[in-house]
Amino acid sequence: MMAPYAIAHLKIGLKLYETGYRFNSDQRARIYLTNALEPNEDFAGTFAFAIPALAQEVEAVNLVKEKKIFTVVIGNPPYSYHSKNKGEWISNLISDYRYVNGEPLGERNPKGLQDDYVKFIRIAQNLLDKAGVGILSYITNHSYSDNPTYRGMRKHLMQSFEQVYFFDLHGNSKKQEVSLNGNKDENIFDIQQGVAILLTTKKSNSNNLSNVFNAELWGSRSEKYRSLNISTITSSNFNKLSPTNPYYLYIDQDTTLRSEYENFLRINEVFTVNSMGITTGNDGKYVGFNNLELERNPAFDPSMIRDVAYRPFDNRSIYYDASKI
């Protein structure tokens, strides 16, 4: 990612120049080229001969990762459900989110915890825990507000910070979200995934759970931009929540009937035999509404096309080649 690294140096350098600030000959903007999801490692010798400047960068960033204390972490980390950042160091940090109240989540597919934005939240939390004080402010995917897979993450954040503000900007076209008044709800970015602003504050390391606040913003993109330009913590109508076991939700939810719901039979107690069924990984390619649709693919062997109960009351055709699905 050399291009954004160079552009960041250029823009910050120009902005500082506009203010009258001048760098000394041995000074630089403290922007570093590194993967924050990896620990400090000594690659300087690898680059010293071929790319001396990069070797110096490695030495500088290793010093930052090892010695520096951070009290403010801000950003818009990437959202990548199929994360390629699977190093041992970050995986060990994320493992804390796989437990709630000392017990494993027990989720069949907790893959959402491997999303890159979750890892960046975990890193920020780790940095501020080391500092003992600080502020975290990210704009990220908003899925962790109520999804059961993230309940360990929500509880863990509540244990680290004194205040947690969750500002849901919605705009999730995957869920076909609409505004409360029925009008169209738009994303502030050109993406399908809904987003939210997370703001947390930490004044000391404490054993008490944090106060959690929630606010929401619906409407068109222009309306959201207009509101965000003038909004502050005190003007955004945050509601104080009381997240409780077992889900620790970051949304305002009516829990009047929860105890009755929790005491009812679970679905796996009613239906004792179950399975995930067929998972193709690419239904658009391997599942069709009829045999003819799949037979049009010249790469498919017609003898492997089968009828399938795709969904309840939804019978379709599937190319059932075990080597591919």
Description of each model-found segment:
Residues 1-167, 171, 175-176:
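SAM-dependent methyltransferase catalytic region
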Residues 84-89, 107, 126-325:
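Sequence-level detector for compositionally biased, low-complexity segments
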